[in-house]
Design a protein with these regions (language model features):
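Catalytic glycan-binding domains that act on GlcNAc-containing polysaccharides
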Residues: 1-183
Length: 186
């Protein structure tokens, strides 16, 4: 079972931010999708880091599929498309602000849609969660609670870790959301 952020752990790989994980009621409050609640810029960031691994995985899945089957053809087509998306994601500088800007384009939004693909999305989100865990381990935090993972995801890994230090526990923090988002689904 994968812990899903922003849903008390009960969300799914296709969970949309703002939609209740059990009743499926509500209105989307952002582009955040899935276990890791990836924003479009996160999807671009993760694809630029791990895209080749995903393409190879799709090709391996195709090789293991029945020869000449629709599934094999579908996976091969998907691998070609994902390779193209990976090249595009890597064509921009590896900077968060550039990923945010690119995420607002049609191509950037198309890349974000890979989260909804059953062969790509769940794994992309798990890789994002694993990255948070690895960052925490490098900082000496071996075990994280769901809330701590959520904080790192929301604030950014480094800032999230800083916010968990004793000095930061009493410091004021930024409100990451627009006020209207709090009232939209009540």
């Amino acid at each position: 079972r994968v812990y899903a952020l922003e849903t008390s752990g009960f969300g799914t790989a296709d969970m949309q931010s703002g939609i209740h994980p059990i009743t499926r009621k509500g209105e989307p409050i952002s582009t955040a999708i899935g276990y890791a609640q990836l924003l479009a810029a996160n999807s671009i960031n993760e694809l630029s880091k791990h895209g080749n691994e995903f393409v190879e995985r799709l090709r391996d899945m195709a090789k293991r599929s029945a020869p000449g089957s629709d599934r094999q053809r579908s996976l091969n087509v998907k691998a070609v498309a994902l390779a193209r998306m990976t090249r595009k994601a890597r064509s921009i500088p590896y900077q968060w602000s550039r990923h945010v800007a690119f995420s607002k384009t049609d191509i950037g939004q198309g890349i974000h849609a890979i989260n909804l693909d059953g062969d790509i999305g769940p794994r992309l989100q798990v890789i994002k969660l694993k990255g948070l865990r690895t960052t925490a381990q490098k900082a000496g935090m071996e075990r994280l609670t769901g809330a701590e993972i959520e904080l790192m995801n929301l604030a950014g890994p480094g800032t999230g870790l800083e916010m968990m230090t004793p000095a930061a526990l009493k410091a004021p923090s930024t409100n990451f959301f627009s006020r209207s988002a709090y009232y939209r689904n009540t």
